[in-house]
């Protein structure tokens, strides 16, 4: 075979002539300072706010502060492998978390990585953690109840599907217990639950997971945990990650979802720490100026979607921890103004044995009343006012002034009502049974029963109804109404005569 040099040269010239360089320039930055979950970087002139960046160590971060010369980034996860001089590159995307049915029953960190030791989570579905809240046209009125199984809440401060109801109180007043009761009570209702633990001890989170497992609630629940041992950036993004997981079920599967943020005080503290480390100007209580937006953009994502979007819902129960019952502090007042009502737990009530320790006077539900069933409205209509007047009369009676018979009778009925509304932890009561019990109390059937026998009366009444009058309970549950008030009165009267 005879190959001529001129032919080779001609082929090479043709190839060179037609060659087009195809390359993508890649911006690279350098870490100049790192510590406490924060990295300061030079370079990356075109990086966007909240864009993901990749460190040489394999850690992922978010571009948080965009300054003239440097970028302030938060590191998501372990920042100990990042050193001064480490290379950083852009990922050109915003933070996403895995979502879907595969996460149900699992414990994950805010990035969706499993931390329960039960293997990898296999899902190809992902959602961005920062998603716009639905607009007015995409929502509909809250009109369907979300039963918590707690008598005091379902009767006086009812929660509707799509509502945001704040649980607020001092440390150790039973805030988490109320949230867990609400999750346990969703068994069999088709509601998907997400529990977001922010800044709690790992042992506390393990206890919560164990409680949910014991009550068969873990199978429809996702636990998102950013524990006290995790860095401030992870605690900051935890609620948004949990919300994205809940939104998948609301938007894609058209389901009702319930999310617990336990608690947003610790998230605000983590955000304050990040902001101060990044030299953002401090405001009231050293929080940055946009701390209101931190919570408003999260809680506005809770909604009851319009029928055109499938009619799914996201109900949010944020928890706020107060110091010495100080409800007028900065973060509590912010979240109170964002939410649709609050359940206020009082230390003095908790210590005196009233559990759940709900202060009826200051607790309110602004939209849940529209979602309350007709049956509960009929029996619990005056309950809040009666209990509030009982509290004021009780304070007045401490003075030792002689009281008339009517006032004494009101005090006696109020004390029995308070006793009736006490409830054991993790023992939610079905809605129809709550209706019967509260009906009996408001109609005066407890008047000649001693206070220490109120719970015995309640227990025996429910046993009697389940055994002999189950059809009445079924009717109330299906119709959400009491059609024959006189008939129910006679049934309880008949039971009372044998008690």
UniProtKB/Swiss-Prot annotation:
Q: Hey, where's the site called Required for activity on this chain?
A: 363
Alphabetical list of Gene3D superfamilies matching this protein: 2.40.30.20, ATP synthase alpha/beta chain, C-terminal domain, P-loop containing nucleotide triphosphate hydrolases
The record's annotation in SUPFAM superfamilies points to: C-terminal domain of alpha and beta subunits of F1 ATP synthase, N-terminal domain of alpha and beta subunits of F1 ATP synthase, P-loop containing nucleoside triphosphate hydrolases
Q: Does the keyword Nuclease apply?
A: no
Q: What is its EC number?
A: 7.1.2.2
CDD domains on file: ATP-synt_F1_alpha_C (cd18113), ATP-synt_F1_alpha_N (cd18116), F1-ATPase_alpha_CD (cd01132)
UniProt KW Transmembrane helix keyword: no
Membrane topology designation: Peripheral membrane protein
Q: Provide the primary localization.
A: membrane
Where it sits in the cell: the answer is:
Cell inner membrane
Instruction: Quote the record's binding site residues for ATP.
Output: 169-176
Summarize the subunit comment: F-type ATPases have 2 components, CF(1) - the catalytic core - and CF(0) - the membrane proton channel. CF(1) has five subunits: alpha(3), beta(3), gamma(1), delta(1), epsilon(1). CF(0) has three main subunits: a(1), b(2) and c(9-12). The alpha and beta chains form an alternating ring which encloses part of the gamma chain. CF(1) is attached to CF(0) by a central stalk formed by the gamma and epsilon chains, while a peripheral stalk is formed by the delta and b chains.
Q: What is its biological role?
A: Produces ATP from ADP in the presence of a proton gradient across the membrane. The alpha chain is a regulatory subunit.
Under HAMAP family, the record lists: ATP_synth_alpha_bact (MF_01346)
Family designation: Belongs to the ATPase alpha/beta chains family.
**Name this protein carries in UniProt:** ATP synthase subunit alpha
